[in-house]
Curated annotation (Swiss-Prot):
Lineage: Bacteria, Thermotogati, Thermotogota, Thermotogae, Thermotogales
Family assignment from sequence similarity: Belongs to the bacterial ribosomal protein bS16 family.
CC terms in the record's Gene Ontology section: cytoplasm; small ribosomal subunit
InterPro entries attached to this UniProt entry: Ribosomal_bS16 (IPR000307), Ribosomal_bS16_CS (IPR020592), Ribosomal_bS16_dom_sf (IPR023803)
Keywords linked to the UniProt accession: Ribonucleoprotein, Ribosomal protein
The name this protein goes by in its record: Small ribosomal subunit protein bS16
Gene3D superfamilies per the UniProt record, alphabetical: 3.30.1320.10
UniProt source species: Thermotoga neapolitana (strain ATCC 49049 / DSM 4359 / NBRC 107923 / NS-E)
Underlying gene: rpsP
Amino acid sequence: MVRIRLTRMGKRKQPFYRIVVVDSRKRRDGAYIESLGYYNPLKEGEIKIDVERAVDWILKGAQPSDTVRDIFKKFGVMKRVHEIKYGKKEEATSE
């Protein structure tokens, strides 16, 4: 199974994470398929994500980890995936 998860970078006591697409059997910091962005918790939650690639990978079946799913919700990635899969909700017309 392909997962979207965080891989740790940076020095000791100064964590920095990359958001990567990886085979679920690989190690946390092992080889990955593609990097989608980064997350720096020390700089007030500095986050950069390639939204289009993230949506593409989720539509292909990649499963985001719980933490990555929360990050994606902040950027509207999960909402966009839902709209693509199930269509936009039509606004109710009131007469």
